[in-house]
Amino acid sequence: MARKAYQPKRRSNSNQNQQRSDSLKKNKQDNLRSKSAGNQQGNEKNKKDIQDQRNKASTKKKRESSGEKYESARDKVIRRFRPGDNALKQLRQYNQTPSLLIRKLPFQRLIREISTRMTEEDSLRWTSFALVLLQTVVEDYMVSFFEDANACALHAKRVTLMSKDLALAARIRGQKNVTGIFIPTKK
């Protein structure tokens, strides 16, 4: 006897439609149940969140009073400086450092250019110590000159430094030819 292949029984279309509608109803009921349970859980979560926020605030106050560091970057207060405060901070920083303010190589090139213009020789030789010494003297002179010019601007009830302040400071010092750059040429 030959075996027949297994074939499942076919259901009628009306039977399938009824099962689909039953499963949809069950899904809707399950969704409604889970939402109502979720709301209860959501309320509990909200309560926990509020308690966590209160705990964080209390620990933050404790940390601030005890002088501990901040917990995270969000806890830090962003400080905004008033206009001019950063400039004054930089001035104090530059006053404390003994290093030179002008870069060495551009200053050396300027000195070599001026020395070739003033002398008939094509190039004078400079030692590195002489260039550094000259640079320190020039920077010291410039700082004191600008301090005097700033005092003239403040006397005129201005904060902005103008060329007339520089000219007045030079005139008080007894210098001449300050209005323009005076570089002698070869004779």
Swiss-Prot record:
Residues 34-43 have a biased composition (Polar residues). Residues 1-12 have a biased composition (Basic residues). Residues 1-76 are annotated as: Disordered. Residues 22-33, 44-55, 64-76 have a biased composition (Basic and acidic residues). Signal peptide: none annotated. Keywords: Centromere, Chromosome, DNA-binding, Nucleosome core, Nucleus. CDD domains: HFD_H3. Its main location: nucleus. It comes from the Eukaryota. Component of centromeric nucleosomes, where DNA is wrapped around a histone octamer core. The octamer contains two molecules each of H2A, H2B, CENPA and H4 assembled in one CENPA-H4 heterotetramer and two H2A-H2B heterodimers. CENPA modulates the DNA-binding characteristics of nucleosomes so that protruding DNA ends have higher flexibility than in nucleosomes containing conventional histone H3. Belongs to the histone H3 family. This is Histone H3-like centromeric protein CNA1. It comes from Tetrahymena thermophila (strain SB210).
